[in-house]
Amino acid sequence: MSQQNGNVNRVGAQDRVGASGGMEHSFGFKAVDENEKQGLVNDVFHKVAKRYDIMNDLMSAGMHRVWKDAMVAWLTPSKRPGWTSLDVAGGTGDIAFRIVEVSGRQAHVTILDINGSMLGVGRERAIKKGLIDNLEFVEANAEELPFEDNSFDAYTIAFGIRNVPHIDKALSEAYRVLKPGGRFLCLEFSEVELPVLDKVYDEWSFRAIPRIGKMITGDADSYSYLVESIRKFPKQQDFAAMIEKAGFERVSYRNFTGGIAALHSGWKL
């Protein structure tokens, strides 16, 4: 794999899970039974669905929009008719809309999310943007995709895979539904690698985000979970190893904003 481009005394310091996984037993910093996690995560996203963009603005200081643009630019969606993409955990449509627009409205994107509230927001936005004809909305689980093998030219997931209980299953399903030659791209909050920025970002995340979330939405707990889930997610190198283990080749990643987020790529060859 290639890269392009000490938690001591830090606020909220926690050990991240490694390449062997373990996210199924953590709901943020809280240890839970793996059968509980999906329901707990669903509750969070039912609560934040209407204000999901605000949530991402808080988590990234507004940078998520730039990162998403870069993600779609690296994907380079085809402008040929019939090119298809699956956007998982994509309920509100941010990535799918960009793909359709960059493709000159040639691409067909299936937006899949386990949360109906998020899909409802995405469908409303798609209608307002006039993009509904290029989109399909599917409520389903990333660990058990309702599609045949070799169905899609691309698979994208942005800020969603850390909320999947069994990440290894989601990666295996991504590999299965991609066509030979298909591309996997995952954008996710990650391990900050700049010594000063990591401390600043921790202070912002643990001190400010839950308080601001409560002021705006009346809900601090959901924002605390989202911050904590970022700190449990595997480091860049460990997640890249998980992607390789699922069968992908030419695995690489790019750090954004000092590692606050990372964009991972792999190919089904």
Curated annotation (Swiss-Prot):
Pathway: Quinol/quinone metabolism; menaquinone biosynthesis; menaquinol from 1,4-dihydroxy-2-naphthoate: step 2/2; Cofactor biosynthesis; ubiquinone biosynthesis
Top-level taxon of the source organism: Bacteria
Enzyme class: transferase
Positions of S-adenosyl-L-methionine binding: 92, 113, 141-142
Keyword tRNA processing belongs to the record: no
Gene Ontology terms, MF aspect: 2-methoxy-6-polyprenyl-1,4-benzoquinol methyltransferase activity; demethylmenaquinone methyltransferase activity
Endpoints of the signal sequence: none
InterPro entries attached to this UniProt entry: SAM-dependent_MTases_sf, UbiE/COQ5_MeTrFase, UbiE/COQ5_MeTrFase_CS
Stored CDD domains: AdoMet_MTases
EC numbers for this chain: 2.1.1.163, 2.1.1.201
Catalysed transformations (reactions): a 2-demethylmenaquinol + S-adenosyl-L-methionine = a menaquinol + S-adenosyl-L-homocysteine + H(+); a 2-methoxy-6-(all-trans-polyprenyl)benzene-1,4-diol + S-adenosyl-L-methionine = a 5-methoxy-2-methyl-3-(all-trans-polyprenyl)benzene-1,4-diol + S-adenosyl-L-homocysteine + H(+)
Biological processes, Gene Ontology terms: aerobic respiration; menaquinone biosynthetic process; methylation
Keywords: Menaquinone biosynthesis, Methyltransferase, S-adenosyl-L-methionine, Transferase, Ubiquinone biosynthesis
Function: Methyltransferase required for the conversion of demethylmenaquinol (DMKH2) to menaquinol (MKH2) and the conversion of 2-polyprenyl-6-methoxy-1,4-benzoquinol (DDMQH2) to 2-polyprenyl-3-methyl-6-methoxy-1,4-benzoquinol (DMQH2).
Family of the protein in this entry: Belongs to the class I-like SAM-binding methyltransferase superfamily. MenG/UbiE family.
NCBIfam families: MenG_MenH_UbiE, PRK00216.1-3, PRK00216.1-5
Protein name (record): Ubiquinone/menaquinone biosynthesis C-methyltransferase UbiE
Organism field: Brucella suis biovar 1 (strain 1330)
Lineage: Bacteria, Pseudomonadati, Pseudomonadota, Alphaproteobacteria, Hyphomicrobiales
